[in-house]
Regions:
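Glycine-rich phosphate/nucleotide-binding loop
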Residues: 3, 64, 75, 125, ...
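Glycine-rich phosphate/diphosphate-binding loop of Rossmann-like nucleotide-binding domains
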Residues: 21-22, 27-50, 155-226
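N-terminal beta-loop-helix "entrance" segment that forms/cooperates
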Residues: 52-75, 231-233
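N-terminal glycine-rich phosphate/adenylate-binding segment common to multiple enzyme folds
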Residues: 66-161, 248-250
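C-terminal non-catalytic interaction/assembly regions of soluble proteins
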Residues: 361-500
Length: 500
């Protein structure tokens, strides 16, 4: 299983032979927990293989958080990342408690690393797995979805997290997945969504996938609802080739895929954007294992292989990857790896790295050796098509209230007299219609969505919405949020209430 073809040529060094490679500037973050141990081991292997690396060590993670930077990265570090355009990162620890933002999400979004490529393969019979022959690439959207990180507490009882999905973001990741499949000779791209429930956001992802698929007639496609898709991935991964999906779903199923293939500790990840890339293992920092020399460096080492291929050092990548495969074949394993063959030896982090170094120049005897020299690069990071502006009309507003004064009928009795020239069309609680004609059995919290519509489908001006809010405030009602209800070329851009 090869991991990744060389990506944007503008970022690549030229490799003709080991002596002529220009050293590749790379920012290296040693990480937290097991991070420093597995990074030292990985760098030792890469450098022993002859990789031309100009390492610029940077501080990220827990120590930076503790120094008062809530993002986990100091301002001056951004300049190093902009200069190198390449980050090799060990796992980091985000301190528990409020006030800290995920550094991984910050890095991916700030640097525009929109594509998260996570290849997963089985190494049977040397690593125990129920699925020998598994070879799946998960392409995860990296910048949007619930990972936008926009959350609010709105009432005593209700918290909110916004799911943001854009047409350009979706188009870029879907096209990236198809280009990856085409240039690596893969036969099928599968799309995972939950558009039977989230018909607008996940519906956009599915529709975009279907539209772009027509441009790649030689590639088979299918679509799965995420729940059954994840179940099928776990039970029969060989039916999948490339999977493209949203941020949250991709995060979850890539761990599932890695675990059923053998171990999460074996799985690498490449985060790709137009202006740079970040390479890391998919697992976390595992603080309880820190300093014990037991962590598996394989995921981070294979991420380093992906980094070398990406940056134009495929021969060095081949040397490392094939030596790693030979090490696995020879039964040199870390403690997390399920053993399939008798006689395998359990070793620590440092000994595993030494074993790989000892096998540099060797190829696996049974597993297929990797060849990166002929891999075709992606010509460019895909660009989204220009946005076609629709005719947008505001036809109503959803006003969300913090209210605990009684029943839905009681609330409607307060709202209707102050509705003015708009009509109270519906009240929902946690998305379920409770007025008109609600059911007494429906459990309600203190968070209410009150839908007001202009009569006869007329347009509703912003001044009309502002006037409505003034009337609600005058009636002593606590509104915590509004959402304008708009049509786009006559098509409603809002969902119905459950039961409406």
């Amino acid at each position: 299983m090869t991991l990744l073809p060389p990506l944007p040529p503008s970022l690549r060094a030229r490799e003709s032979d080991a002596q002529s490679i220009r050293p590749m500037p790379v920012a290296v973050a040693m990480g937290d927990g097991i991070g420093p141990e597995i990074m030292r081991a990985s760098l030792a292997v890469l450098q022993a293989a002859g990789a031309a690396l100009e390492i610029r060590e940077i501080a990220l993670g827990e120590a930076v958080y503790r120094a008062g930077h809530s993002s986990g990265i100091a301002p001056e570090t951004w300049e190093v990342l902009r200069a190198t355009r390449l980050l090799y990162k060990a796992p980091i620890t985000t301190p528990q408690g409020g006030g800290y933002k995920s550094l991984n999400v910050t890095l991916r979004k700030t640097l525009g690393l929109f594509a998260n490529v996570r290849p997963t393969g089985a190494y049977a019979p040397f690593v125990a797995t129920r699925h020998p022959g598994m070879d799946v690439v998960i392409v995860r959207e990296n910048e949007e979805d619930l990972y936008a990180g926009i959350e609010h507490r709105q009432t005593d009882e209700v918290y909110q997290c916004l799911k943001l999905v854009s047409r350009p973001g979706t188009e870029k990741i879907v096209r990236f997945a198809f280009e990856h499949a085409r240039r690596n000779g893969r036969r099928k791209v599968s799309c995972f969504t939950k558009d039977n429930i989230m018909k607008l956001t996940d519906g956009l992802f599915h529709k975009t996938f279907d539209a772009i698929a027509k441009e790649y007639p030689e590639i088979a496609t299918d679509h799965w609802i995420i729940d059954i898709g994840a179940a099928r991935l776990a039970s029969n991964p060989k039916q999948f080739d490339v999977i493209v999906t949203g941020n949250l779903y991709g995060d979850i199923i890539s761990d599932i895929a890695a675990e059923i293939a053998g171990s999460v500790g074996l799985a690498p990840s490449a985060n790709i954007g137009a202006h740079g890339a970040m390479f890391e293992a998919i697992h976390g920092s595992a603080p309880p294992l820190a300093g014990r020399d037991v962590a598996n460096p394989s995921g981070l080492l294979l991420a380093g292989v992906m980094m070398l291929v990406h940056a134009g050092q495929p021969r060095m990548a081949e040397r490392v990857h094939n030596a790693w495969l030979r090490t696995i074949e020879d039964g040199v394993h870390t403690a997390d790896m399920p053993q399939a063959a008798p006689g395998a030896t359990r070793v620590g982090t440092r000994a595993f790295a030494r074993a790989v170094i000892d096998r540099l120049g060797l190829a696996p005897r049974q597993l297929p050796p990797v060849r990166y020299g002929e891999a075709a690069p992606l010509v460019a990071v895909p660009e989204a098509a220009p946005t076609v502006r629709a005719e947008k009309r505001t036809v109503g507003v959803d006003v969300f209230l913090h209210w605990s004064g009684g029943t839905p009928d009681n609330l409607a009795a307060l709202l209707r007299p102050v509705a003015g020239d708009v009509e109270l069309a519906m009240i929902t609680n946690r998305g379920v219609k409770v007025w008109p004609q609600g059911l007494a059995e429906t459990f309600c919290t203190d968070h209410w969505r009150c839908r007001f519509l202009a009569p006869g489908g007329q347009a509703l001006a912003h001044t009309g919405i502002a006037a409505l809010l003034l009337r609600l405030a005058g009636a002593g009602l606590d509104f915590v949020k509004t959402e304008h209800l708009c049509t786009f070329d006559g098509v409603p851009g809002f969902s119905l209430g459950q039961g409406q």
